[in-house]
Regions:
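C-terminal boundary and immediately downstream tail of ABC-type ATPase nucleotide-binding domains
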Residues: 146-170
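Conserved ABC ATPase "signature" region
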Residues: 34-52
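Conserved ABC ATPase signature
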Residues: 57-61, 65
């Protein structure tokens, strides 16, 4: 209950509509009255910009919309922590940026601690306030997004400068 989870593949129930998917944690973890649950669901869908799709089925949604539904479900419990596993997996670059912006905005608005597991360097730089770099299960580096570009750790540099744009910056 302390942790809201955004799964890599969104993990929506195909047999439930958007509203039911978002409400699911409330149904299994709380004894909140139904009216209150629906108000929370609508509020969370509004926060992620999907307040008009609560009756749609997951099969009717784009990948970005599914991620937003997953985010709404992850925050519906007012959790202290939000854990995002590869939130940009399977998204086009523009949608990935929008999801990063949304995660950062919600982290600040809801005053939650957000942990993001990612291999997307854009996400690291854009939403990473405090970054920990793990390689083969070991912590090799930690710091902020300004210092990550100035490190001399070979494995981290290979990750940071793995795409052509970042190589040009270096």
């Amino acid at each position: 209950r302390e942790i809201g989870m955004l799964f890599q593949g969104s993990a929506l129930f195909d047999s439930k509509n958007v509203g039911e998917n978002v409400k699911f944690p409330l149904d299994i973890l709380t004894e909140t009255p139904e009216k209150e649950k629906l108000e929370k669901v609508n509020h969370c869908l509004e926060l992620v910009g999907l307040n008009k799709v609560n009756q749609k089925m997951p099969s009717e949604l784009s990948g970005g919309m599914k991620k937003r539904v997953g985010i709404a479900r992850a925050i519906v419990n007012d959790s202290k922590y939000l854990f995002c596993d590869e939130p940009n997996s399977g998204l086009d670059p523009l949608t990935a940026i929008k999801i990063d912006d949304l995660i950062l905005e919600l982290t600040q608005k809801l005053k939650t601690t957000t942990i993001v597991v990612t291999h997307d360097m854009n996400s690291v730089v854009e939403i990473g306030e405090y970054i920990m770099f793990l390689h083969e299960g070991k912590k090799l580096w930690e710091g902020n997004n300004k210092k990550i570009l100035k490190t001399n750790i070979k494995e981290l540099n290979e990750f940071v400068f793995s795409n052509k744009l970042m190589k040009k910056i270096k």
